[in-house]
């Protein structure tokens, strides 16, 4: 998280740290007593046995509870080149349970109305400056940052200028024309909260999530 501040798992008990070969590389969010939602580009092509997730801890690399996985379900229409439909469900091999620091998140439904310029919060354990490598991740305390939703047409035109396509399945956020706040390497797959509800792209996938989680 760039431009944010330290937070705690008590403030965001649905956060999950995704571990590849026991090393934090992505974020996720608890959605029920067995599943974590993340981005498909995180586990795509990997063996299920290479992944675990940690819940209930402010620290990405210690504390809380670590779960092995029974399966990883990537969205069937995920496109690894355009990152369209970039969503995945990691199912734990055992029940996650709940506590003050472990809670499933509420997920925006298909009728959730998220306007432009709305305050949203991104959370994660990733790099705190642009260009931070995996080896330099702070990996200590969870961080959060306040950003804002960006108009879809504005976002699409900005990305088109650098040869990237923004689809209707994507949600844009940041600090438009100011910058300095955002998610970064290692935050991929983590939640974007609007009034404590996970929004990001999930409102377009609610039925798929419910069917597979």
Swiss-Prot record:
Gene3D superfamilies (UniProt xref): Trypsin-like serine proteases (2.40.10.10)
Class of enzymatic activity (EC top level): hydrolase
Active site: 41, 86, 188
Disulfide bonds: 26-42, 155-172
Gene Ontology terms: biological process: proteolysis
Record Pfam families: Trypsin (PF00089)
Keyword Protease: yes
GO cellular component: extracellular region
Tissue expression summary: Hemolymph and saliva of the larval form (caterpillar).
Family, similarity comment: Belongs to the peptidase S1 family.
Protein known as: Achelase-1
Source organism (scientific name): Lonomia achelous
